[in-house]
């Protein structure tokens, strides 16, 4: 039996995500599809626009059989850590086939993963502080293997391939060409499939008139979006971030995960006069750091995620089961006793005391305050029949 895996954020779930699930199902009609999905915070350092339970339900309604939460400790990270965590967890759950969307599905990603893993580690110790790490990495990959990977989904795809090739048994990779708008398109396009970025932007600017989104969303998802009273975004959170930076000492800021090279001084210096989050990012931006890297740092700061806490979380890695259907339930019964990765179906004080789940539950407290609904305690996996 083949087991299909997909790494996702679904922020929010749209027709492009449904297309990828359909492509996976065409290849393997009766085998389980497992989704490893980011929770209430996503890779580029922001809150998800819908909570993890609603997004998991959308995936199940569109063909996924099991949806697990990728812990915050891996979800809000650069591509290599994000990919490494998600691929290892999927592999542990028995996944043998990985489906992912890319701009160019003709590349041999397994070959790229093998070649990049052969590059000596000291060749990746980039020292050019006038360029971002991502830029230097992409230039190195282009130089070593002859392919540029400067588009967001291509970068993630290569990271998946690198992580897969580090497994004892690498996954079979199935790249699927993305349809419709580009990953970062800001505005809705006259296409069947829009970018998640454009959909989020539309929600923020037209919260009381979302009917325009209907053609870009699977059945039922427009109604779910319309029910929301709040669409989380950094403008909502900026005053909390401002208070956090202004009230924290330099020593406290220095302890934050990924705080480096004197960024605590720059944040302290610029936060007081910043009018909004966008202007603050511009003020602390340098050639060394991408905006995504700085957004993640701001999120770690807002949530008070320290280096010590992040590293401690990796000593006890688990995943929260968000939902399943009958095929997913049957597969889970079959593998549960043999899987090393702890699968959490119910959050309680004991399992939420430490590890990735402990950090996840703690940072979700802010999301709960914004959205007004519990995200962990008292919640059980969604069952779709």
From Swiss-Prot:
The answer on whether this UniProt entry bears the keyword Iron reads: no
Instruction: State the UniProt keywords alphabetically.
Output: ATP-binding, Cytoplasm, Ligase, Nucleotide-binding, RNA-binding, tRNA processing, tRNA-binding
- Residues annotated for ATP binding in this entry: 7-20, 101, 153, 178
User: What are the BP-aspect GO terms?
Assistant: tRNA modification
Superkingdom, natural source: Bacteria
Q: Does the keyword Metal-binding apply?
A: no
Q: Which reaction does it catalyse?
A: cytidine(34) in elongator tRNA(Met) + acetate + ATP = N(4)-acetylcytidine(34) in elongator tRNA(Met) + AMP + diphosphate
Localization recorded for this chain is: Cytoplasm
What general EC class does the enzyme of this chain belong to? ligase
Q: Which GO molecular function entries does the Swiss-Prot or TrEMBL record give?
A: ATP binding; ligase activity, forming carbon-nitrogen bonds; tRNA binding
Coiled-coil boundaries: none
Primary localisation category: cytoplasm
Entry EC no(s)? 6.3.4.-
Q: Which GO terms describe its cellular component?
A: cytoplasm
What HAMAP family would the database entry show?
TmcAL (MF_01539)
Which family, according to UniProt? Belongs to the TmcAL family.
Q: What does this protein do?
A: Catalyzes the formation of N(4)-acetylcytidine (ac(4)C) at the wobble position of elongator tRNA(Met), using acetate and ATP as substrates. First activates an acetate ion to form acetyladenylate (Ac-AMP) and then transfers the acetyl group to tRNA to form ac(4)C34.
PANTHER family, per database record = TRNA(MET) CYTIDINE ACETATE LIGASE
Identification of the protein by name: tRNA(Met) cytidine acetate ligase
């Amino acid at each position: 039996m083949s087991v299909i895996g997909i790494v996702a954020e679904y922020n929010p779930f749209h027709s492009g995500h449904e297309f990828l699930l359909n492509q996976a199902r065409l290849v393997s009609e009766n085998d389980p599809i497992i989704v490893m999905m980011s929770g209430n915070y996503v890779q580029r350092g922001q809150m998800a626009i819908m909570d993890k339970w609603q997004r998991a339900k959308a995936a199940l309604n569109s063909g996924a059989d099991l949806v697990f939460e990728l812990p915050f400790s891996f979800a809000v990270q650069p591509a290599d850590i994000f990919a490494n965590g998600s691929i290892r967890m999927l592999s542990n759950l028995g996944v043998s086939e990985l489906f992912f969307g890319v701009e160019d599905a003709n590349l041999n990603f397994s070959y790229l993963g093998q070649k990049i893993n052969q590059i000596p580690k000291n060749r990746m110790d980039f020292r050019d502080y006038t360029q971002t790490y991502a830029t230097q990495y992409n230039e190195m990959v282009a130089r070593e293997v002859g392919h540029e990977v400067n588009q967001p989904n291509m970068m993630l795809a290569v990271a998946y391939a690198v992580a897969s090739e580090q497994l004892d048994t690498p996954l079979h990779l199935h790249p699927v060409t993305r349809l419709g708008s580009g990953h970062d398109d800001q505005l809705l396009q006259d296409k069947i499939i829009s970018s998640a970025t454009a959909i989020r932007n539309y929600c923020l600017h037209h919260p009381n008139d979302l009917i325009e989104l209907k053609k870009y969303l699977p059945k039922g998802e427009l109604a779910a979006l319309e029910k929301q009273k709040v669409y989380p975004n950094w403008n909502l959170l900026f005053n909390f971030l401002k208070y956090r930076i202004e009230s924290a000492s330099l020593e406290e800021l220095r302890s934050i995960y990924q705080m480096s090279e004197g960024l605590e001084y720059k944040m302290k210096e610029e936060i007081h006069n910043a009018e909004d989050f966008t202007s603050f990012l511009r003020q602390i931006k340098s050639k060394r750091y991408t905006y995504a890297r700085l957004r993640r740092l701001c999120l770690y700061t807002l949530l008070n995620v320290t280096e010590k806490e992040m590293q401690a979380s990796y000593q006890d890695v688990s995943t929260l089961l968000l939902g399943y259907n009958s095929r997913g339930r049957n597969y889970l019964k079959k593998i549960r006793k043999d899987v090393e990765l702890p699968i959490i179906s119910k959050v309680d004080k004991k399992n939420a005391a430490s590890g990735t789940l402990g950090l996840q539950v703690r940072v979700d407290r802010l999301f709960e305050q914004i959205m007004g609904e519990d995200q962990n305690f008292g919640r059980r996996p969604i069952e779709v029949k």
